């Protein structure tokens, strides 16, 4: 079992070798659009946290550098991970350093000019010249002269920088791929956006911003206030807006097969396991990074919980997967259930609610999956309650089960019968599981949780 996830890589000689989500068609069409763009443009690529944006950007870079593209339309490609490469805290210097690493510039003129500008130089020079004064009309003549000189120096530096950048992009064009912007400090992210918009506005330069728009909007509001129209503000920075499409069910299965090989846990390839763990990405987004973390969490807990062939007793692995999902979706309910303080019917109602999108009235998973999930949750809850309540009596009659199920969930339509039969099967398969053993499993889940 591997504890550290392998970093995604894409190479120009085979850009899609590690494409686990079937995104080749999306990448090639997106890159074709970038190559065909004339003049200057800023393109935003929006996707929720953990949707695979970084992998998409890396495949774009590799495809653009491939001989297939370079032989027909040569283009220079610069990758900039704002989270990892924002070393100086100065977006312009960081960006130019990344560009200079890819483009031959013996005299380092681009870097020298960038240093003169000092990323967002106009605003910084105004603050320096005014001594922090807010009322520009109150400036003295000397300060006004300093202010005028600062503006002239900034404008001259801007023109010089754009001239040098344009020369670098003139022959083949330049595509700058910026990733992980929404993970940066709000002030850095906003300054980088302004830098791109106002200093990289050069013919032949195409900028791609891979972002989580919702998260970046929060960064904007943290600076300008909660009532600020952040989405409208962000749209001003891009000329074209693209949306990363979520993977469908077969593509998710391929992703789990990749995780199975990467982590070294064979049970990740079992349908019941991967379908269950994939629920951490429900109900409102694909959450691939959440799924990856859940897979590592599951493998670690399974290794810590399996002793003397315990997993051969029934479906311990499936139960662990379900508990991890419940913890991810509703931690308070999970903790209450683990402590024997949550009734099994309440636990099932919690699962239904957690898996129901905000815009829907029903869970976003198939009935069969939901029944299995509810049955295991109810069974495990019964065991934890037995450990803390001396007078606890398990439900043995279908009629009693159905009545309590409908009261807790508000759902009938034959569901109670399906869940009750699955609960009986689960209870028989997991008859070896004692309250003490259940406690060690939940302790391992809490200990090795990613967050």
Per-range role (PLM):
Residues 6, 358-451:
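Charge-biased C-terminal accessory regions appended to nucleic-acid-, cytoskeletal NTPase
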Residues 1-70, 77, 420-451:
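Walker A/P-loop-proximal flanking segment of P-loop NTPase domains
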Residues 118-130, 240-315:
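Conserved AAA+ ATPase small/helical "lid" subdomain
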Residues 289, 293, 297-379:
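Alpha-helical lid/collar subdomain of P-loop NTPases
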Residues 51, 57-167:
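P-loop NTPase nucleotide-binding core
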Residues 178-184:
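Conserved Walker B
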Residues 1-18, 22-27, 63, 155, ...:
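The catalytic "switch" region of P-loop NTPases
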Residues 44-46, 81, 178:
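Residues at the beta-strand->loop junction immediately N-terminal to the Walker
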């Amino acid at each position: 079992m591997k504890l550290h996830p392998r970093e995604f890589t894409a190479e120009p000689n085979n850009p899609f070798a590690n494409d686990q989500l079937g995104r080749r068609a999306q990448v090639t069409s997106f890159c074709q659009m970038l190559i065909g763009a004339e003049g200057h443009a800023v393109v935003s690529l929006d996707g929720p946290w953990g949707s695979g944006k970084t992998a998409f950007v890396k495949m774009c870079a590799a495809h653009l550098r491939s001989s297939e593209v370079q032989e027909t339309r040569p283009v220079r490609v610069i990758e900039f991970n704002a989270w990892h490469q924002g070393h100086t805290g100065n977006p312009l210097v960081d960006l130019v350093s990344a560009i200079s690493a890819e483009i031959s510039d013996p005299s380092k003129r681009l870097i020298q000019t960038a240093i003169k500008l000092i990323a967002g130089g106009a605003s910084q020079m105004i603050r320096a010249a005014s001594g922090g004064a807010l009322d520009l009309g109150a400036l003295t003549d000397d300060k006004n002269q300093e202010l005028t000189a600062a503006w002239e120096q900034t404008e001259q530096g801007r023109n010089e920088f754009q001239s040098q950048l344009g020369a670098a992009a003139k022959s083949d064009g330049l595509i700058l791929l910026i990733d992980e912007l929404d993970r940066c400090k709000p002030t850095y992210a906003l300054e980088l956006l302004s830098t791109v918009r106002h200093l990289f506005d050069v013919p032949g330069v195409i900028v791609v911003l891979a972002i989580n728009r919702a998260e970046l909007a929060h960064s904007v509001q943290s600076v300008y206030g909660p009532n600020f129209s952040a989405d409208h503000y962000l749209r001003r920075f891009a000329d074209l807006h693209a949306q990363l499409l979520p993977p469908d069910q077969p593509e998710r299965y391929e992703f789990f097969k990749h995780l199975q090989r990467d982590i070294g846990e064979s049970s990740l390839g079992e349908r019941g396991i991967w379908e269950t763990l994939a629920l951490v990405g429900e109900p409102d987004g694909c959450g691939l990074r959440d799924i990856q973390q859940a897979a590592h969490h599951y493998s670690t807990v399974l290794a810590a919980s399996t002793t003397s062939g315990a997993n051969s007793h029934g479906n311990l692995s499936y139960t662990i997967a379900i508990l991890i999902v419940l913890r991810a979706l509703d931690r308070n309910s999970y903790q209450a259930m683990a402590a024997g303080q949550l009734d099994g019917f309440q636990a099932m109602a919690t699962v239904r609610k957690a898996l129901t999108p905000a815009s829907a009235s029903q869970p976003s998973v198939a009935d069969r999956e939901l029944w299995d999930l509810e049955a295991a949750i109810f069974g495990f809850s019964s065991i934890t309650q037995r450990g803390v309540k001396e007078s606890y009596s398990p439900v043995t009659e279908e009629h009693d089960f159905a009545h309590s199920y409908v009261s807790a969930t508000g759902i009938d339509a034959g569901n109670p019968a399906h869940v009750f039969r699955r609960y009986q099967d689960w209870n028989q398969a997991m008859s070896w599981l004692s309250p003490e053993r259940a406690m060690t499993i939940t302790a391992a889940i809490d200990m090795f949780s990613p967050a």
